[in-house]
């Protein structure tokens, strides 16, 4: 048996993914696949067709074909057995036998095809072996990773212990009326998650560099951020110890890229034929001395129906809001029905909702100056010292039912004074020298982690650290409004539906 190519194509002969096992040009394989639909005889139940030069062995898969192109003298029974294995491989990687899904997983399919056939000849493998080979599962790699994770945990514990010692030394020095030595960025050792490398690199603060790159390295003058005082030797010894345990100490920019690359994206929503998107956006302005100047929140329920048989439905809305939200339905929605029974349905029950389009059926608005309504309070306390400012920032979650993700608190910094010296910190930080900002990053703020603080020192005046800006995203909405049930107008039978909830920031400032 000599297998020339394996391909998944449409019924019109358009190639979606194709793997050639012998040398063959793209024009040649596209021509063979384009000719394939014209050769099939719908009146016969054969699963192969032949031309003067090649044989097509195929299997229909809904709107697609799995096609093997072989030489004419190949064993047709072996070809059919190989075709069945190819057809079983595709559902392993694709959730649906559709063109978009095949294209999205084309490389996974090609890797699997290569495990089945090598140089035109069938390999003696089964489906389980193909799955194992493509996953490249290795016991040695698992052992190595386990050892690596243990070393990282030990290094983090050592860093936390060292940070506490340095912080205690600083407090003792302040009690005695002495200036505490700068401790660099070791406060960032309390970071949760991410690689150890990204945490350690924050302790290495770059000095101001000359603008001319090719010039020989020259000292640019002492930098306050590098004055580690009597503790400098201990810091160097600690970094050397981490290196001996297998840690790579790299530049701070590389560390930032590493920590950013490790962010895990949320999995895609599994959308049903009836899908609802609940979205809220908040605009908030607070004063630095306390007091809510303005808070405005806008929310909306967007309905999307992808199957016209579910066009005539009603949404059961549960409103547990106690903050005085103003609700407004779409003009085509029966307002009396919503007011009396909290049901969203069309005024004319014989009509259907639009299909394959997002329709806003309910929106709400909340505007207030009540401080107790602030979801996340931020207190920034800059105090002038002899060499600049000591800044303390605290956050506290006031809405315990919320879970805020990817929280970033951005503090402006004065320009031309170098990097800040970080003391205590919950979470991690990034210093953007181009935009002169310090970003305090917290992966999650919830009822278990509802408060935290950041301390840093830098030259400047108290007004230099405002306005403080906040951004976050949440999968729980602020105004507890949910769709609990969807039923059809006729028969009141329940309908499966999916919901996607997002609560995000439009503008969140402390002036």
From Swiss-Prot:
UniProt keywords, alphabetically: Acetylation, Cytoplasm, Cytoplasmic vesicle, ER-Golgi transport, Golgi apparatus, Membrane, Phosphoprotein, Protein transport, Transport
Annotated MHD domain residues: 271-511
Tissue specificity annotation: Ubiquitously expressed.
A Pfam short name: Clat_adaptor_s
Residues modified to N6-acetyllysine: 233, 241, 309, 351
Gene Ontology biological-process entries: adult locomotory behavior; cerebellar Purkinje cell layer maturation; endoplasmic reticulum to Golgi vesicle-mediated transport; Golgi localization; intra-Golgi vesicle-mediated transport; pigmentation; protein transport; retrograde vesicle-mediated transport, Golgi to endoplasmic reticulum
PROSITE patterns noted in UniProt: MHD
Region Disordered, annotated ranges: 168-196
Subcellular location(s) per record: Cytoplasm; Golgi apparatus membrane; Cytoplasmic vesicle, COPI-coated vesicle membrane
Gene3D superfamilies: 3.30.450.60, Mu homology domain, subdomain B (2.60.40.1170)
Domain of life: Eukaryota
Modified residues (Phosphoserine): 223, 244, 493
Topological relation to the membrane, as annotated: Peripheral membrane protein
GO cellular component: COPI vesicle coat; endoplasmic reticulum; Golgi membrane
Sequence ranges of Basic and acidic residues compositional bias: 168-177
Subunit structure: Oligomeric complex that consists of at least the alpha, beta, beta', gamma, delta, epsilon and zeta subunits.
Stated family: Belongs to the adaptor complexes medium subunit family. Delta-COP subfamily.
Cited function: The coatomer is a cytosolic protein complex that binds to dilysine motifs and reversibly associates with Golgi non-clathrin-coated vesicles, which further mediate biosynthetic protein transport from the ER, via the Golgi up to the trans Golgi network. Coatomer complex is required for budding from Golgi membranes, and is essential for the retrograde Golgi-to-ER transport of dilysine-tagged proteins.
Protein's name according to its UniProt entry: Coatomer subunit delta
Gene designation: ARCN1
């Amino acid at each position: 048996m000599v297998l020339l190519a394996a391909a998944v194509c449409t019924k019109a002969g358009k190639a979606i993914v194709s793997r050639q096992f012998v040398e063959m040009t793209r024009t040649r394989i596209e021509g063979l696949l384009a000719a394939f639909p014209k050769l099939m005889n719908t009146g016969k139940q054969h699963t192969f067709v032949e031309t003067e030069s090649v044989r097509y062995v195929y299997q229909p898969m809904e709107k697609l074909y799995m096609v093997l192109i072989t030489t004419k003298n190949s064993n047709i029974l072996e070809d059919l057995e190989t075709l069945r294995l190819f057809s079983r491989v595709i559902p392993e990687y694709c959730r649906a036998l559709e063109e978009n899904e095949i294209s999205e997983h084309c490389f996974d399919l090609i890797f699997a095809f290569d495990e089945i056939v090598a140089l035109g000849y069938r390999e003696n493998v089964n489906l389980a072996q193909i799955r194992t080979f493509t996953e490249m599962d290795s016991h040695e790699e698992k052992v190595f990773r386990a050892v690596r994770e243990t070393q990282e945990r030990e290094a983090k514990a050592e860093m936390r212990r060292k940070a506490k010692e340095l912080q205690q030394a600083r407090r003792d020095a302040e009690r005695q009326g002495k200036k505490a030595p700068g401790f660099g960025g070791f406060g960032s050792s309390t970071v949760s998650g991410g690689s150890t490398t990204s945490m350690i690199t924050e302790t290495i603060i770059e000095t101001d560099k000359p603008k001319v790159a090719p010039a020989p390295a020259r000292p640019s003058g002492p930098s306050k951020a590098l004055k580690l005082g009597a503790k400098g030797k201990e810091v160097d010894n600690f970094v050397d110890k981490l290196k001996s345990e297998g840690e790579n100490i790299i530049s701070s920019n590389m560390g930032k890229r590493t920590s950013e690359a490790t962010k895990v994206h949320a999995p895609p929503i599994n959308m049903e034929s009836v899908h609802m998107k609940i979205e809220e956006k908040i605009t908030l302005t607070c004063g630095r001395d306390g007091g809510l100047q303005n808070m405005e929140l806008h929310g909306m329920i967007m309905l999307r129906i992808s199957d016209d048989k579910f066009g005539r439905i009603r949404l059961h809305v549960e409103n547990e809001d106690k903050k005085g939200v103003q609700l407004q339905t779409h003009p085509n929605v029966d307002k009396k029905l919503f007011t009396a029974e909290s049901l969203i349905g069309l005024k004319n029950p014989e009509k259907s909702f639009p299909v394959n389009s997002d329709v806003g059926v309910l929106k709400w608005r909340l505007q207030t100056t009540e401080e107790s309504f602030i979801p996340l309070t931020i207190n920034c306390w800059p105090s002038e010292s002899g060499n600049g400012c000591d800044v303390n920032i605290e956050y506290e979650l006031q809405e315990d039912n919320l879970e805020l993700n990817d929280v970033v608190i951005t503090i402006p910094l004065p320009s031309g004074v170098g990097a800040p010296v970080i003391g205590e910190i919950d979470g991690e930080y990034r210093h953007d020298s181009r935009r002169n900002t310090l970003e305090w990053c917290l992966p999650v703020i919830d009822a278990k982690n509802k408060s935290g603080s950041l301390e840093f020192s830098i030259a400047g005046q108290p007004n230099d650290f405002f306005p403080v800006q906040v951004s976050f995203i949440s999968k729980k909405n602020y105004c507890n409004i949910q769709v609990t049930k969807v039923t059809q107008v006729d028969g009141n039978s329940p309908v499966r539906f999916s919901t996607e909830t997002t609560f995000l920031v439009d503008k969140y400032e402390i002036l």
